């Protein structure tokens, strides 16, 4: 998958011509499911997940090369005093991922998932969205193109996650711009903002959306003005996966905000995606509902870093294993329905 040129027009062209699911593979999966040694529907969402895998991969459900991709970026809006942690923590956590010391490392080992971490110019934070656009169109498009390379090594299930001090503020601004309501509807504690700091966070989101209000009718403009490098890269990765018919699991509040940009640009853009979990960040459930999705897990987590999507990958792998490994009634000599 490659994209020539940097303007948003390249991505608008891709978004207008998205591949759809494979109807024949879906029918074949449903037919096999009907023969397995269980009552119809007894595996609940596991059956739906197996059908989803078949429809998007075009083959019997299987997960052989799952990958977690984490995109890390820094944000100029942290200068507004909206988070208790300094931006240096983003780089420190990238190093922790590399050393195997983060929660995501343990989950990847547990579920046998690959892990890639993408450092997105951490020494050069985006513009402060309360004062200027986060990125130029050229930089935003280039970062989307970079994110598309997440699938270059090959994967058949992509888990999307992020790391970035200040990025729940970014996610709140994107959701506020896309869906309205009030800034307070979308702002939560993130890494621990409370009291006056939480109020500064609300004020920053209000100020940012007001500043850019004349340019918020275009989802890609929302992304470049209010987003960040990890937002753009995640959007690029999700889009690249769609073009290559790779199923995607989306992680938490920030990853869902990146996905929402694509959904706003094309209502079918997330048909190949499932939401891995609903986080404890207050705006996440509402943003998932706006996407018309139902999360696979609800564990009260709010870490980000791809952790919820990675845990959900274990469920997806189980769904594929049940579909492919269970015996049929005929094979097992079990009587079917009268």
UniProtKB/Swiss-Prot annotation:
Its EC number is 2.4.2.21. It catalyses: 5,6-dimethylbenzimidazole + nicotinate beta-D-ribonucleotide = alpha-ribazole 5'-phosphate + nicotinate + H(+). The active site is at residue 305. Keywords: Cobalamin biosynthesis, Glycosyltransferase, Transferase. Pathway: Nucleoside biosynthesis; alpha-ribazole biosynthesis; alpha-ribazole from 5,6-dimethylbenzimidazole: step 1/2. One of its GO terms (molecular function) is nicotinate-nucleotide-dimethylbenzimidazole phosphoribosyltransferase activity. It is an enzyme of class 2 (transferase). The keyword Transferase applies. PANTHER family: NICOTINATE-NUCLEOTIDE--DIMETHYLBENZIMIDAZOLE PHOSPHORIBOSYLTRANSFERASE. The gene is cobT. Catalyzes the synthesis of alpha-ribazole-5'-phosphate from nicotinate mononucleotide (NAMN) and 5,6-dimethylbenzimidazole (DMB). It comes from the Bacteria. This is Nicotinate-nucleotide--dimethylbenzimidazole phosphoribosyltransferase. InterPro entries: Nict_dMeBzImd_PRibTrfase, Nict_dMeBzImd_PRibTrfase_bact, Nict_dMeBzImd_PRibTrfase_N, Nict_dMeBzImd_PRibTrfase_sf. Belongs to the CobT family. Pfam families: DBI_PRT (PF02277). GO terms for biological process: cobalamin biosynthetic process.
């Amino acid at each position: 998958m490659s994209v020539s040129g940097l303007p948003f027009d390249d991505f608008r062209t891709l978004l207008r011509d998205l591949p759809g699911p494979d109807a024949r593979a879906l029918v074949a999966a449903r037919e096999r499911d009907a023969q397995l040694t269980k009552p119809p529907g007894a595996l609940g969402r596991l059956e739906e997940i197996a059908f989803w895998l078949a429809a998007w991969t075009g083959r019997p459900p299987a997960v052989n090369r799952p990958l977690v991709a984490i995109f890390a970026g820094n944000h100029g809006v942290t200068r507004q005093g909206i988070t208790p942690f300094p931006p240096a923590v983003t780089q420190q956590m990238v190093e922790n991922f590399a050393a195997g010391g983060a929660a995501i490392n343990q989950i990847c080992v547990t579920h046998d998932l690959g892990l890639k971490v993408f450092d997105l110019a951490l020494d050069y934070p985006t513009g402060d969205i309360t004062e200027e656009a986060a990125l130029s169109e050229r930089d935003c498009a280039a970062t989307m193109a970079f994110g598309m390379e997440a699938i270059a090594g090959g994967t058949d299930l992509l888990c999307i996650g992020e790391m970035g001090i200040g990025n729940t503020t970014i996610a709140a601004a994107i959701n506020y711009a896309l869906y309205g309501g009030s800034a307070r509807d979308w702002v939560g504690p993130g890494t621990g903002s409370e009291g006056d700091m939480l109020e500064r966070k609300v004020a920053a989101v209000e100020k940012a959306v007001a500043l850019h209000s004349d340019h918020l009718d275009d989802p890609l403009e929302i992304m470049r003005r209010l987003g960040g490098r990890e937002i753009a890269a995640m959007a690029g990765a999700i889009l690249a996966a769609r073009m290559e018919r790779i199923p995607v699991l989306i992680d938490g509040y920030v990853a869902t905000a990146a996905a929402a940009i694509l959904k706003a640009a094309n209502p079918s853009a997330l048909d190949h995606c499932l939401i891995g979990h609903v986080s404890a960040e207050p705006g996440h459930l509402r943003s998932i509902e706006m996407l018309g999705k139902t999360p696979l897990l609800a564990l009260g987590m709010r870490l980000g870093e791809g952790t919820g999507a990675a845990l959900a990958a274990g469920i997806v792998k189980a769904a594929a294993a049940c579909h492919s490994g269970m015996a049929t009634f005929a094979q097992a000599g079990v009587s079917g329905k009268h």
